[in-house]
Amino acid sequence: MVRYMVTSALPYANGPIHAGHLAGAYLPADIFVRYLRLKGEEVIFISGTDEHGTPITFRALKEGKSPREIVDYYHEHIKTTFERAKISFDYFGRTELPVHYRISQDFFLKALENDHLIKKVSKQAYCEHDKMFLPDRYVIGTCPYCGAENQRGDQCEVCGHPLTPEELINPRCNICGNPITFRDSAHYYIKMQDFAEKLKEWVQSQEHWKPNVKNTVLGWIEEGLEERAITRDLNWGIPVPLDDEDVKGKVLYVWFEAPIGYISITVEHLKREGKENEWKKFWLNLDGGTKVIHFIGKDNIPFHAIFWPAFLMAYGKYKEEETEAEWLLPYDIPANEYLNLEGKKFSTSRNWAIWVHEFLDAFPADYLRYYLTAIMPETRDSDFSFADFKTKINEELVNNLGNFVHRALTFVNRYFDGVVPERGELDDLDRQAFEEIEKALKETGELISTYRFKDALRRVMELAIFGNRYFDYQKPWKTAKENRERTATTVNVSLQIVKVLGVLLEPFLPDASEKIWHLLNLEETKRWEFIEIPAGHRVRRAEILFRKVTDEDIIFFIVNYIARGNPESARLLLDKYYRTDDVVKVALERFGEKRKDEAMAILKSIYGERLEKKAKKEKKKEGGKVEYVKFEDFMKLDLRVGKIVDVQDHPNADKLYVVKVDLGNEVRQLVAGLKKYYSKDDLLNRYVVIIANLEPKKLRGIESQGMLLAADDGENVALLMPDKEVKLGARIR
């Protein structure tokens, strides 16, 4: 039986996680691992924070804190974000642990012992102004390969080519902005040329790798592999484990020790589980039964497919007591491309990004997981668009998937008292339904196994589409009046489809999957197979599975989150889709009266003079001549007293009621946004005032034949009502 060691790239503990990170290395891995677990495979899924190197020291320098304070804070922040996004790591560790120091130093010493390291004196970037050697990331300049400006001295973010500070054109200090000099400094280098041929043969034999990964790696090897430094002039990191004055006070380069974190985190995890020695079967070639799979973004391809395998080769055989084995080289490295935002690359410095922890404050995790999977940059860069996000959630999740599940559960409760009925004789469409169930399981599994997550999700949604079409064709609302056996068969088959959807959705939308399991009242463990719900099984009442995303939701998210990081980014997003007046209205409504000043401050930061001109215009309007309403216009309103005789939840909106109001000579149906302020019992039999001659209007699909009158001070809503009982239909004058 194959076992799997699955990793996601170690995120730097110097900032939060954005949607590009999630779509690149974490969500794909989680989908894959959840599928393996449903299949009953043996799998360990780990990641952890990368807590050394210049990104951490640079952040600490900017914030006036110690590196330890930075990594402790962001380790917890990132870990919590992944938990909220339902990324199901078996263990999320960190590299600032003794076990990681020990194993990393062991790798260094073994490579030195095997003559794969060389000590050299080389020119290192130095800032005369700040009186310090500069790590590569502290140096910026123009990339010599593509001409992109303001690129760091370790890698070009535009073309992806690794760099050294000496290669940069016009290099300067990223702290003070002054030109840099270069001074002699002794460091240890790994002789990458020792592994060139072996790496080339190994990569060429990986026929199952993604073309973008394989081609990138072979291109690098063809260019020639050179010696690369694996120690740095830094005071934060893992000390070089040698009694050598030349490297005293220096540390292991983070790009050397970070991937070793996959091993140290696994060791720490299994030690905590009481299985201290089991790490060997996941990282050593003991029986050929383990597949090591690294999920990464494309910027990490060279480090995982060239340098990391070279480090494993440089170590040689692992020997301990009765164990002697080679390290396992990666079985697969399914790297994803980049995610953009509204047609432009993510930029954390300009806050042109979707920060995951903020997005999850505004929308359910399943919504983010669904959309990122639907647009996953598997073979080319893809684009996050708020308009597309809204469309996909509303049309695909709500109208397709959620609608089908709700229909099936509603009918079994309405016509069979919540009990799964016996099937009668199957017709051709019934038989096709069972074929579709089996095909969906088989084909979705095959797509996930080959990392085609976007297609796999589409295949799941095709089963939901089939379910709706099946339901429409069989017309159970019609057969319920004339053929109960036919209705029972339709409902039974529909519920079988719902159950399989609950299984198929587990890798993609774990919360929705769990809710379907709850609504079906199932206690069995989910497995990647079709096991029927038996007739006679009782299910729960239908509940709304997904709520629609509104323009108001998106406006509030941009104003409340993106604008705080960079008002200019927020303005660009808002101007693309919305009128300024609409944004102001939504912001003031969502922030409420108590936070009005806060809302206005944010809006002013977004719109500047545009908002000030509008405010002056409104102030002049308010402070000048009062705009009177003519008596004749007022008399056009038909205000009448009524009594609420029925209150129901709106099926398509969680803040609205559908109420019936008795006006004496007729009963009107109204839609009212009172759920936050009144319970159903509070409203029932209450006298109210309505506008009776307001033109009917559909609100979320339900017609409202008038309007209830209420006072609203921004915090509370109070219905208007006569102070004593009067005849129903009495007119307000």
Swiss-Prot record:
<dbReference type="InterPro" id="IPR009080">
    <property type="entry name" value="tRNAsynth_Ia_anticodon-bd"/>
</dbReference>
<dbReference type="GO" id="GO:0005829">
    <property type="term" value="C:cytosol"/>
</dbReference>
<dbReference type="InterPro" id="IPR033911">
    <property type="entry name" value="MetRS_core"/>
</dbReference>
<keyword id="KW-0067">ATP-binding</keyword>
<feature type="domain" description="tRNA-binding">
    <location>
        <begin position="633"/>
        <end position="733"/>
    </location>
</feature>
<dbReference type="InterPro" id="IPR004495">
    <property type="entry name" value="Met-tRNA-synth_bsu_C"/>
</dbReference>
<dbReference type="GO" id="GO:0006431">
    <property type="term" value="P:methionyl-tRNA aminoacylation"/>
</dbReference>
<dbReference type="InterPro" id="IPR041872">
    <property type="entry name" value="Anticodon_Met"/>
</dbReference>
<dbReference type="InterPro" id="IPR015413">
    <property type="entry name" value="Methionyl/Leucyl_tRNA_Synth"/>
</dbReference>
<feature type="binding site">
    <location>
        <position position="159"/>
    </location>
    <ligand>
        <name>Zn(2+)</name>
    </ligand>
</feature>
<comment type="subunit">
    <text>Homodimer.</text>
</comment>
<dbReference type="InterPro" id="IPR012340">
    <property type="entry name" value="NA-bd_OB-fold"/>
</dbReference>
<feature type="short sequence motif" description="'KMSKS' region">
    <location>
        <begin position="345"/>
        <end position="349"/>
    </location>
</feature>
<dbReference type="GO" id="GO:0046872">
    <property type="term" value="F:metal ion binding"/>
</dbReference>
<feature type="binding site">
    <location>
        <position position="156"/>
    </location>
    <ligand>
        <name>Zn(2+)</name>
    </ligand>
</feature>
<keyword id="KW-0648">Protein biosynthesis</keyword>
<feature type="short sequence motif" description="'HIGH' region">
    <location>
        <begin position="11"/>
        <end position="21"/>
    </location>
</feature>
<keyword id="KW-0436">Ligase</keyword>
<feature type="binding site">
    <location>
        <position position="143"/>
    </location>
    <ligand>
        <name>Zn(2+)</name>
    </ligand>
</feature>
<keyword id="KW-0030">Aminoacyl-tRNA synthetase</keyword>
<protein>
    <recommendedName>
        <fullName>Methionine--tRNA ligase</fullName>
        <ecNumber>6.1.1.10</ecNumber>
    </recommendedName>
</protein>
<dbReference type="InterPro" id="IPR002547">
    <property type="entry name" value="tRNA-bd_dom"/>
</dbReference>
<keyword id="KW-0963">Cytoplasm</keyword>
<dbReference type="GO" id="GO:0004825">
    <property type="term" value="F:methionine-tRNA ligase activity"/>
</dbReference>
<keyword id="KW-0479">Metal-binding</keyword>
<dbReference type="Pfam" id="PF09334">
    <property type="entry name" value="tRNA-synt_1g"/>
</dbReference>
<comment type="function">
    <text>Is required not only for elongation of protein synthesis but also for the initiation of all mRNA translation through initiator tRNA(fMet) aminoacylation.</text>
</comment>
<keyword id="KW-0694">RNA-binding</keyword>
<dbReference type="InterPro" id="IPR014729">
    <property type="entry name" value="Rossmann-like_a/b/a_fold"/>
</dbReference>
<dbReference type="GO" id="GO:0005524">
    <property type="term" value="F:ATP binding"/>
</dbReference>
<dbReference type="InterPro" id="IPR001412">
    <property type="entry name" value="aa-tRNA-synth_I_CS"/>
</dbReference>
<comment type="similarity">
    <text>Belongs to the class-I aminoacyl-tRNA synthetase family. MetG type 1 subfamily.</text>
</comment>
<keyword id="KW-0820">tRNA-binding</keyword>
<dbReference type="InterPro" id="IPR014758">
    <property type="entry name" value="Met-tRNA_synth"/>
</dbReference>
<dbReference type="InterPro" id="IPR029038">
    <property type="entry name" value="MetRS_Zn"/>
</dbReference>
<dbReference type="GO" id="GO:0000049">
    <property type="term" value="F:tRNA binding"/>
</dbReference>
<keyword id="KW-0862">Zinc</keyword>
<dbReference type="Pfam" id="PF01588">
    <property type="entry name" value="tRNA_bind"/>
</dbReference>
<dbReference type="Pfam" id="PF19303">
    <property type="entry name" value="Anticodon_3"/>
</dbReference>
<dbReference type="InterPro" id="IPR023458">
    <property type="entry name" value="Met-tRNA_ligase_1"/>
</dbReference>
<keyword id="KW-0547">Nucleotide-binding</keyword>
<feature type="binding site">
    <location>
        <position position="348"/>
    </location>
    <ligand>
        <name>ATP</name>
    </ligand>
</feature>
